[in-house]
């Protein structure tokens, strides 16, 4: 249990929130949402003790332990991978180190012997004898093979370090768990494992995430940071979003009678409660929904960008033909081989792979930015493309302001460019910012504005939700669903894939798995699982 009392946090003159009084209880997973800069990560840092609040206090239940997903991926470079995970249970780790120091002595005093006996008793109580095997199992579940367990953290890639940090946070079943963007850099299979793991925990969990499906799958309550306040609502992200949209519509219709509004809200709650009846947390969630005061629901202050992709030209029937394509990484690793497919009009294809470099390599090849190791590709004569690369660093090395930067990529005067930027939530003095000082989210919104200028009939998107907040992801997602052209994309966002893709192509070192089916059917199909095992392990 975590009790927050009279918490206030401000930076300079800017007050993030004040008078925060909340109690987070065991058995609940709280999804923390809010606009970029609202203070989601700051709240977790204040709870963990990493940040001193301006006022107020945070208390854990008596004797309880708190674990945090570390954001510094270099902090443990000098340690063994397995030891890093074991450090997640600090009392156990300290016990192990003290035992090791005692037993390394050439001679032990009587006091040493008594202390060793105490340590052994506590070691057993903390399941110390199974600790290494449990830590190893946690690493394996998160995609870290046994061959890496004895290596130094400094030898791992950043993607691998992220998984070790997550294993460290989860290890030892802490009473309270704080997870800031836990799905970042995880493949979809590992995210699915994490969803299953968290759905069965009995601890108190707070999680910040921009993955809507993940939030919906795991959270029983939503912590909304808005209007300078921190408010807890019953239900998951989708319930919060739909209820907020409903409240906005009602606010806009001022003539609607109060009683009609109340009935509409109550009917909405009943309907949503029925829709979540299949969830694992259904009993507790339904009880919370029943207690919800409909008068508490209010429109969000958050803004959604206006993302509209329009085609200048209708595509013909020949979109893209790929034959025998192969890509090899710099170290000689085969990313994919013998890739053959034809893209037909209207198809929105998600590309998957165990190795994220495979999708990037494919997109770079078909955009002419990289040579294939073998094979050919051919675009249809009517096709125009707009490409959103994974790494956009090169686009933002100039000191141009946003208007001048965007003007490079399409026709139109300053007013037109400001209009595009305004729809992407850049207004007033923002449009005069230098592009080389933009945040990751601001850069991504600029890249999306650039793509809209192209009026292309085929969009190529490499992990497009990176750095975007939930509002931008929602707006992006909604427009792509209605886009009439073709889309080729990769993503770690389950909801994004499920709602946009109508075809799935998985790239493996031994060819492709190519299916016309939705994503949920694909990941839960036993036949597909068997086929994947075969294609990756030939």
What is each model feature region?
Residues 1-253, 312-538:
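ABC ATP-binding cassette signature C-motif
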Residues 103, 107, 241, 270-273, ...:
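A structural signal for long alpha-helical coiled-coils and helix-turn connectors
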Residues 113, 186, 283-294:
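Extended non-transmembrane interhelical loops and adjacent amphipathic helices
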Residues 143, 185, 259-260, 298:
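Short helix-capping and inter-helix turn/linker motifs at the boundaries of alpha-helical repeat units
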Residues 251-271, 278-287, 303, 308, ...:
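ABC ATPase nucleotide-binding domains
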């Amino acid at each position: 249990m975590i009790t927050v009392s009279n918490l206030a946090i401000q930076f300079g003159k800017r007050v993030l929130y004040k008078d925060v009084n909340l109690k987070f209880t065991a058995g609940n997973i709280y999804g923390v949402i809010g606009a970029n800069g609202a203070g989601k990560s700051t709240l977790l840092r204040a709870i963990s003790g990493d940040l001193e609040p301006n006022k107020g206090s945070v208390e854990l239940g008596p004797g309880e332990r708190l674990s945090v997903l570390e954001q510094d991926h270099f902090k443990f470079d000098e340690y063994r991978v397995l030891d890093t995970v074991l450090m997640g249970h600090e009392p156990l780790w300290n016990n192990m180190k003290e035992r090791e120091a005692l037993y390394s002595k050439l001679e032990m005093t009587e006091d040493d012997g008594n202390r060793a006996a105490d340590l052994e008793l506590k070691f057993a109580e903390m399941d110390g004898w199974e600790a290494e095997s449990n830590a190893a199992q946690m690493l394996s579940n998160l995609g870290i093979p046994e061959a890496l367990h004895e290596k130094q953290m400094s030898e791992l890639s950043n993607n691998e370090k992220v998984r070790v940090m997550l294993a460290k946070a989860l290890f030892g079943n802490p009473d309270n768990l704080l997870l800031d963007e836990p799905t970042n850099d995880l493949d979809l299979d590992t995210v699915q494992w994490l969803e299953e793991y968290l759905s069965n925990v009995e601890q108190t969990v707070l999680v910040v995430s921009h993955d809507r499906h993940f939030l919906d799958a795991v959270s029983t309550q939503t912590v909304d940071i808005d209007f300078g306040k921190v408010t807890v609502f019953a239900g998951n992200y989708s319930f919060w979003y739909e209820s907020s949209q409903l409240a906005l519509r009602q606010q806009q219709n001022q003539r609607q009678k109060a009683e009609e509004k109340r009935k509409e809200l109550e009917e909405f709650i009943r309907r949503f409660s029925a829709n979540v009846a299949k969830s694992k947390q259904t009993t507790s969630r339904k009880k919370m929904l029943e207690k919800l005061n409909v008068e508490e629901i209010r429109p969000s202050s958050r803004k959604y960008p206006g993302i509209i992709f329009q085609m200048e030209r209708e595509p013909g029937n020949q979109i893209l033909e790929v034959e025998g394509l192969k890509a090899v990484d710099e170290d000689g690793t085969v990313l994919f081989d013998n890739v053959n497919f034809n893209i037909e009009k209207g198809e929105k294809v998600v590309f998957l792979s165990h190795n994220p470099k495979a999708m990037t390599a494919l997109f770079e090849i078909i955009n002419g930015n990289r040579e294939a190791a073998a094979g050919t590709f051919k675009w249809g004569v009517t096709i125009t493309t707009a490409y959103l690369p994974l790494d956009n660093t090169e686009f933002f090395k100039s000191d141009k302001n946003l208007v001048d930067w965007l003007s490079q990529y399409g026709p139109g005067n300053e007013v037109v460019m400001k209009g595009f930027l305004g729809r992407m939530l850049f207004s007033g003095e923002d449009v005069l910012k230098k592009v080389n000082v933009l945040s990751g989210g601001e850069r991504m919104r600029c890249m999306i504005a650039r793509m809209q200028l192209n009026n292309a009939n085929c969009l190529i998107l490499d992990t497009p939700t990176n750095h975007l907040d939930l509002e931008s992801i929602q707006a992006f997602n909604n427009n792509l669903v209605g886009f009439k052209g073709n889309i080729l994309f990769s993503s770690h966002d389950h909801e994004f894939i499920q709602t946009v893709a109508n075809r799935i192509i998985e790239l493996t070192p031994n060819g492709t798995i190519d299916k016309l089916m939705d994503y949920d059917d694909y990941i839960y199909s036993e036949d597909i699982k068997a086929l994947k095992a075969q294609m990756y392990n030939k």
